[in-house]
């Protein structure tokens, strides 16, 4: 039996929407990374771009476990003295999208295909998003934070 290799014409990019309210950051990131890579499809191949578009809403209501609120997210501009350190509590208040983008980026493979797949991730702080016309399918994450109960 021959191995099936998906052709670019066979690949479709579906739209999914995930509500991040009271969902733990790691579980949300795993689900988003798997959808972005297309691992939910039977035609998945690690070298082919079979991923989906993922919309994450309510990024400002995400749950962080442990002492992550005190930890810092580091980024560097590449210039001397360009190190930025922002605490998760500060980012959750000002730019909650950056927390999710950073977590999902870390769960994608480190290659050129991941850059393309990451462009299909759309993160919004509130419930409003401009992608209603794409009719995204709702993707449920069963486990929510224990702190929300």
Curated annotation (Swiss-Prot):
Keywords: Ribonucleoprotein, Ribosomal protein. CDD domains: Ribosomal_L13. It holds the Pfam family Ribosomal_L13. The keyword Cell wall biogenesis/degradation does not apply. GO terms for molecular function: mRNA binding; structural constituent of ribosome. Transmembrane segments: none annotated. GO terms for cellular component: cytosolic large ribosomal subunit. GO terms for biological process: negative regulation of translation; translation. SUPFAM superfamilies: Ribosomal protein L13. The keyword Nucleotide-binding does not apply. Part of the 50S ribosomal subunit. Belongs to the universal ribosomal protein uL13 family. This protein is one of the early assembly proteins of the 50S ribosomal subunit, although it is not seen to bind rRNA by itself. It is important during the early stages of 50S assembly. This is Large ribosomal subunit protein uL13. It comes from Bifidobacterium animalis subsp. lactis (strain AD011). The gene is rplM.
């Amino acid at each position: 039996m021959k191995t099936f290799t998906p052709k670019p014409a066979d690949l479709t990019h579906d739209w999914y929407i995930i509500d991040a309210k009271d969902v733990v950051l790691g579980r949300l990131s795993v689900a988003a990374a798997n959808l972005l890579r297309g691992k939910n499809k039977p035609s998945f191949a690690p070298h082919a771009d079979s991923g989906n578009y993922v919309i994450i809403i309510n990024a400002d209501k995400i749950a962080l476990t442990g002492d992550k609120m005190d930890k810092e997210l580091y980024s560097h501009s590449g210039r001397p003295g360009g190190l930025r350190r922002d605490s998760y509590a500060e980012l959750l208040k000002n730019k909650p999208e950056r927390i999710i983008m950073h977590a999902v980026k870390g769960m994608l493979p480190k290659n050129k295909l991941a850059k393309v797949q990451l462009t299909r991730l759309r993160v919004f702080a509130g419930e409003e998003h401009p992608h209603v016309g794409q009719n995204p399918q709702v993707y449920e994450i069963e486990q929510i934070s224990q702190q929300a109960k």
